[in-house]
Amino acid sequence: MEKYEKLEKVGEGTYGKVYKAMEKTTGKLVALKKTRLEMDEEGIPPTALREISLLQMLSQSIYIVRLLCVEHVIQSKDSTVSHSPKSNLYLVFEYLDTDLKKFIDSHRKGSNPRPLEASLVQRFMFQLFKGVAHCHSHGVLHRDLKPQNLLLDKDKGILKIADLGLSRAFTVPLKAYTHEIVTLWYRAPEVLLGSTHYSTAVDIWSVGCIFAEMIRRQALFPGDSEFQQLLHIFRLLGTPTEQQWPGVMALRDWHVYPKWEPQDLSRAVPSLSPEGIDLLTQMLKYNPAERISAKAALDHPYFDSLDKSQF
């Protein structure tokens, strides 16, 4: 790791510490993710190797944060502690200095609160669908999409998906290591209800929540427990029925909930165009099989006024 000078710790990600660093020879900024992957005598677990090769392949899309290289650091052997040297994997990513959460916050708080421009939301959504469609076409679910995981290249106006593809080998814990609870606000109802057979539709639900948040500048469903999260969803969209969502009552964590009627979604996102409301409605369907796919979303009328040739 002599190649890099660590400048500051920028986060404690779901998978380990994240540092802003500089490549000494070029002066280029990178993000170093130190993964908590204890090696054994066998070396790097094959699951991790598969994930890394997948990540390298996926990061060929400009809408996915690029994985530049992987550094395997073996720490010097300490005979008093263990018989074999410990080693760490560092994933070296391109560095981007802001994320969608910070960007939304800057429009909500501070000296100049203002809505995000409708055309900007449209551009960000198109890029997000491009990135998600790219992942899904390779059979990869993100499973933890949220504004903090969407990094922005403000100069080029590009949105990129981060923290991707590690979700299987490194299993997403319920608590990040700073003991903040991993947010439930973007989690699909089938996951909250304990379904183990989920699909690409879980990511579409998350993208729908992110879409609404860009319009509202605050979370659509800000629950602080799995139960409260479901109640937030049911109060707005109505309590799901077996007719609407076949099999919902057989899910592991289904209980008898109060029966709420669906509200008018446009009241939750009053400044969104009718086409935008239609797209959001198709993303927040209870039955995962009925949710629009990322690929189909790219052709939705909401994007008709967008010059797609630039993407």
UniProtKB/Swiss-Prot annotation:
Record keywords, A-Z: ATP-binding, Kinase, Nucleotide-binding, Phosphoprotein, Serine/threonine-protein kinase, Transferase
UniProt-annotated binding residues for ATP: V10, G11, E12, G13, T14, Y15, G16, K17, V18, K33
Matches recorded under InterPro entries: CDK, Kinase-like_dom_sf, Prot_kinase_dom, Protein_kinase_ATP_BS, Ser/Thr_kinase_AS
Lineage: Eukaryota, Viridiplantae, Streptophyta, Embryophyta, Tracheophyta
Catalysis performed (reactions): L-seryl-[protein] + ATP = O-phospho-L-seryl-[protein] + ADP + H(+); L-threonyl-[protein] + ATP = O-phospho-L-threonyl-[protein] + ADP + H(+); [DNA-directed RNA polymerase] + ATP = phospho-[DNA-directed RNA polymerase] + ADP + H(+)
Protein task: Together with CDKB1-1, promotes both the last division in the stomatal cell lineage as well as the number of stomata. In collaboration with MYB124 and MYB88, restrict the G1/S transition and chloroplast and nuclear number during stomatal formation, and normally maintain fate and developmental progression throughout the stomatal cell lineage.
EC number, UniProt record: 2.7.11.22, 2.7.11.23
Residue positions where Phosphotyrosine is found in the record: Y15
Example of a GO MF term: protein serine kinase activity
Enzyme class per UniProt: transferase
Pfam families associated with the record: Pkinase
Positions of the catalytic residues: D144 (proton acceptor)
Protein name: Cyclin-dependent kinase B1-2
Gene Ontology cellular component terms for the protein in this record: cyclin-dependent protein kinase holoenzyme complex
Residue ranges annotated for the Protein kinase domain, each copy included: 4-303
UniProt subunit comment: Interacts with CKS1.
